[in-house]
Structures are given as structure tokens and as C-alpha cells.
């Protein structure tokens, strides 16, 4: 008969506990990683990932978020295009361009609406984009936001670039040029819109992207939407649904726990306190997460792409595989 001393039993129990702990730790580490493109700029795009990571929504939904932050939008998209990262949240018409250039991407949901895209003017006599005829607008001509403005003005019979002179400038420079009276209007997005209204309350918003898009299409449009690379979906078939659930969790924090979201924005993107809250409370920052494969949502995304083709940005529509389907 084999007997054990009390000391031997204690040692055996400790060893079992250590093995059990190691097994649990190893199991926890088995969550698949998803590498995402983010930005070091003080904008709301990286805040989505920051809230997701800080709140543990990645682990809650079965994956580990691996954030890769880049100092420029071009590097942000380039990393996704080359496969350095596997997911991002980007402009639907920019993703359209990448797809047609051979990037194997799949749009699987929606993100921010066009409500945070605004055009500011200082002159009280300028009340709409039509009033900018013969004047100058500062805008980033390489961004999807400019494409939205171009599509809108086309629908209104305004030749943007001819009737309205466009000065190419990123959002911060566009705002600075309006401040210095070098242009008559500036295209900006959140959080710069809320910062601008705090610093220059006399400036007027003469165009809002969501309102303008609904005016010409009868439906909402999307500023940014989430996409995954096709090989990531092949490796991890549940990735779209896991990410979509985590994005919905982020949207809930933005809209229902705005003070907590504002604190994360201050801590991680160095935004002034209250700016995110102002953007959400004003209705300019609207995060609406829906599956892209639902018929109405798919149509709202592809409609933007069709209008980009009609406006002359691209020659043809992408095939149906650009939208993920379970």
C-alpha cells in the first residue's frame, strides 16, 4: 500500500494547481489575434480600437486585438493593403479603390455615418455650398469626404473644381486657412468640428454630410465602414461576426456611456476633455453598427460606390465579393 505524508500531499496539490493554472493561462492565450490599422492622429478612428481594447471587448468576443498605429492615413491604408494588418475602418469609396487595385478585402459592417463631415464658413452670407460659387473651399482631395462633397455638388449641378475652386489641404490645414481668410470655407470632420465650434463659435456649418447625402439619395451614407482581408476570414471564419459584436459594444459605450468614452479619448488620443462628448451630444458623431450583408445595408454601401463611379472617380463597379456574406 502506497502512503503519502501530509507534506507530500501538499506538494502534490501545489503541483496540480500549477499545472491547472498553466493550462488555463495557455487556454486564455489561444484567442486568435486580429491585427488592425489605427492612427496616431487625434481623430476618432483610432478611438474605436482604443475603447475596444480598454474595455476588453476583444476578449469578450473571442479574439485578441493587435493595434498597429500609423502616423499618416496613407500608411494606415498601405499596411492593410500589403497584409501587415488584417482589418481597418475606412471610407467605403476608398475601400472600393483598394479592392479594384487587387486588395482582397471584404466589407462586413457599418461604422460612422456621414454626420461628422461638415463644411465651415466665416462669412454669414455664405449659407450653403451653392453660395461658394466663385469662391474657394479648402478640402483634402485624396479623402473619401471630398468624394462625398463632389457627388453632392454633381447632383446639384455644381462643378466642384470649376464653379468652386478647391484648395487641397488636410483637415487641420483647411481649418487654419479659413482662420487666416485664405479660403472661404473649409471641409473638416470630427473631432476637429467640435474643437472648431468651441474655439470659433461664430463660424457656421453650411453643409453636413449626412443631411446632404439624404437629400440626394433618400438614405443614410457611411463615412467609414469596417473591412477584413479575405485570407483572415479564411483563417478565422468567425472574424466578421466577432469584430461586428465588439464594434457594437464600442457603439454602446459611445452613445450610452459617453463620459467614460470621453475619458478614454483624453487618455489615448490626447483630445481636450469634453470634445468627444460634444460630438456625440450634437448628433455629429453617430456610430451605427449593422451587418453589411443585410439587403438594405448592402444597398446603402453599394449606392455610394455607384455614385463614385458616376462622379468619375472610378471606371467601373467592383464585383459583389467586396461585401462579405456569411
What do the PLM-derived regions correspond to, one by one?
Residues 11, 134, 198:
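Phosphate-coordinating loops and pocket residues in cytosolic domains that bind phosphorylated ligands
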Residues 18-26:
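C-terminal segment of classical bacterial N-terminal signal peptides
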Residues 59-60, 210-219, 287-296:
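Short, solvent-exposed loop/beta-turn-alpha elements that line the ligand-binding surface or hinge
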Residues 234-313:
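Secondary-structure end/capping motifs
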